[in-house]
């Protein structure tokens, strides 16, 4: 009609309108809290019952700069564990190439790209190791929350809201999809369907931090029991490797969670 302005929507704008309309008009997602909790408990029980586990993973750690730009640090690696007290992990992220080995008594942190390693006595279970790595070394293990002994109790203790969001496909595998909310933290998890439920993707959002940075880990090539084989949980220093102390390790560039050109509180 003459006199009326003509509006043109780009594909992205049209999609945004559709998504916004869905968010406003749709009823609460499947919203069966009891079923979501039951299926999550089944997964943690299954994973907790496995004496040997191995998988590969891809992870992204999101950081927010002081000018509120979001950046994602991508890494990939492997995990092999044997309950109750052995684990070997690797993490390669471009700026870092780390290996963590625990034989039930000694924890070794080895920077392959630097050929430097440190060792410390941490006797005890995997649960104890997870706590030590996070609190004393600021080096959390990939998806560690999902593999500790009382995983379900730990991850749901502070939950205030649960959503069953139906299903999704991760890495070509159909999964049940759940979202949980706690104070300052939202987390989502995708769990394979069937008799052997396992985590496929785990996303943690820090809602207590401006712009809500996320940590995402996607698990693949999952193995249990005899499929794992006989992993070696002893550390053998390669030729020329130098041992350093824990305090010195903290000062070495590109052996931590962030690249050397990143600083906490800034960019």
Residue ranges and their predicted role:
Residues 31-39, 67, 71, 110-174, ...:
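Flexible, processing/modification-adjacent segments and terminal tails
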Residues 2-15:
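Bacterial N-terminal signal peptides that target proteins for export
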Residues 34-116, 197:
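N-terminal mature ectodomain segment of secretory-pathway/periplasmic proteins
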Residues 13-24:
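Bacterial N-terminal signal peptides
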């Amino acid at each position: 009609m003459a006199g009326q302005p003509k509006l043109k929507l780009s594909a992205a704008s049209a999609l945004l309108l559709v998504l916004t309309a869905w968010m406003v008009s749709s009823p609460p997602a499947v919203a069966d809290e009891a079923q979501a909790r039951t299926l999550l408990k089944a997964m943690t029980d299954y994973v907790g019952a496995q004496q040997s586990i191995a998988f590969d993973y891809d992870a992204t750690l999101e950081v927010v700069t002081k000018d509120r730009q979001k950046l994602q640090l991508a890494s990939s690696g492997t995990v092999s564990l044997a309950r109750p007290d052995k684990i070997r992990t690797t993490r390669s992220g471009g700026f870092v190439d780390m290996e963590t080995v625990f034989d039930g008594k000694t924890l070794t942190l080895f920077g392959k790209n630097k050929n430097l390693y440190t060792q410390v006595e941490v006797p005890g279970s995997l649960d104890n190791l997870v706590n030590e790595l996070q609190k004393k070394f600021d080096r959390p293990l990939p998806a560690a929350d999902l593999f500790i002994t009382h995983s379900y109790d730990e991850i749901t203790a502070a939950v205030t809201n649960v959503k069953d969001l139906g299903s999704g496909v991760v890495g070509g595998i159909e999964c049940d999809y759940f979202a949980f909310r706690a104070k300052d933290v939202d987390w989502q998890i995708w769990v394979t369907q069937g008799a052997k439920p396992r985590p496929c993707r785990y996303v943690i959002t820090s809602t207590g931090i401006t712009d809500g940075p996320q940590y995402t880990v996607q698990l693949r090539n999952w193995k249990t029991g005899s499929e794992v084989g006989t992993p070696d949980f002893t550390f053998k220093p390669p030729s020329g490797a130098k041992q350093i102390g824990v305090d010195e390790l903290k000062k070495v560039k590109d052996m931590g969670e962030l690249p050397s050109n990143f600083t906490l509180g800034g960019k």
